[in-house]
Structure formats: structure tokens, C-alpha cells
């Protein structure tokens, strides 16, 4: 039993050493590739859609609130034809969580 434990510890030690050597070699090559990609990267931020504005053109374009991103809700208004209307809105749960966080910030300081 002691021999089995000794060999398993030895095996794990050798395995972890060999895997770290392979990872170190991979990391150095990956870092050079990543740096060259980052040098060529361009910022492509598009304008976000403010709260309560129409987001039917891009349903993932709603702006962020203090903590959470607003959600694009689509609905069919009553009395009109079957035209879908979408707007960026803050879910009630997110509103309550932001209020609790604001209260906690004022209490804690």
C-alpha cells in the first residue's frame, strides 16, 4: 500500500511538471500571437439605444444601466394593426436590485 501511494505521488509530480513545461512553451508562442493581434485590433463600438427608445432595428443594442444592460421588449399595442413595437426597458427585478445596491452604498459609505 505504501509503495502504491509513493508511486502515485511520484507519477503526479512528474505529470504536473511535464504539463507545466508544455504550457509554458505554448504560452510564450500564444503571447506573441496575441500581442500582434492586439496591435491590429480596432475599436468597433456602435451607438447603443437609450431606454424607452425603439430597438426593433437591433434588439441587442440597448444601453447599460448602472449595473445591468437594458432589455429590448417587443409587444403588439392594442387598437392598432399587427405591427410589432419594440423598446429598451429596464426589468423590474433589475430596478429593485439597483435600488438595494444604492441604499447599501449610502449606508456603508
Curated annotation (Swiss-Prot):
Signal peptide: 1-22
Purpose of the protein: Enhances the high-affinity desensitization of human P2RX3 purinoceptors.
The record's note on its domains: The toxin is composed of 2 domains: a highly rigid N-terminal inhibitor cystine knot (knottin) domain and a rather flexible C-terminal linear cationic cytotoxin domain that forms amphiphilic alpha-helices.
Keyword field: Calcium channel impairing toxin, Disulfide bond, Ion channel impairing toxin, Knottin, Secreted, Signal, Toxin
Subcellular location: Secreted
Chain intervals for the UniProt region annotation (Linear cationic cytotoxin domain): 89-108
Propeptide stretches in the record: 23-44
Organism: Lycosa singoriensis (Wolf spider)
Tissue specificity comment: Expressed by the venom gland.
Lineage: Eukaryota, Metazoa, Ecdysozoa, Arthropoda, Chelicerata
Pfam families listed in its UniProt record: Toxin_35
Region (Knottin domain): 45-88
Family label: Belongs to the neurotoxin 19 (CSTX) family. 05 (U4-Lctx) subfamily.
GO MF annotations, alphabetized: calcium channel regulator activity; toxin activity
Keyword Heme recorded: no
Disulfide bonds: 48-63, 55-72, 62-88, 74-86
Name used for this protein in its record: U4-lycotoxin-Ls1a
Keyword Secreted: yes
Amino acid at each position: 500500500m505504501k509503495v502504491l501511494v509513493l508511486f502515485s505521488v511520484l507519477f503526479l509530480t512528474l505529470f504536473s511538471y511535464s504539463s507545466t513545461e508544455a504550457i509554458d512553451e505554448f504560452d510564450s508562442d500564444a503571447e506573441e500571437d496575441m500581442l500582434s493581434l492586439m496591435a491590429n485590433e480596432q475599436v468597433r463600438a456602435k451607438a447603443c439605444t437609450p431606454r424607452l427608445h425603439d430597438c426593433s432595428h437591433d434588439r441587442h443594442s440597448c444601453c447599460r444601466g448602472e449595473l445591468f444592460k437594458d432589455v429590448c421588449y417587443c409587444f403588439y399595442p392594442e387598437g392598432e394593426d399587427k405591427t410589432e413595437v419594440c423598446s429598451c426597458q429596464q426589468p423590474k427585478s433589475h430596478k429593485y436590485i439597483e435600488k438595494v445596491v444604492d441604499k447599501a452604498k449610502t449606508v456603508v459609505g
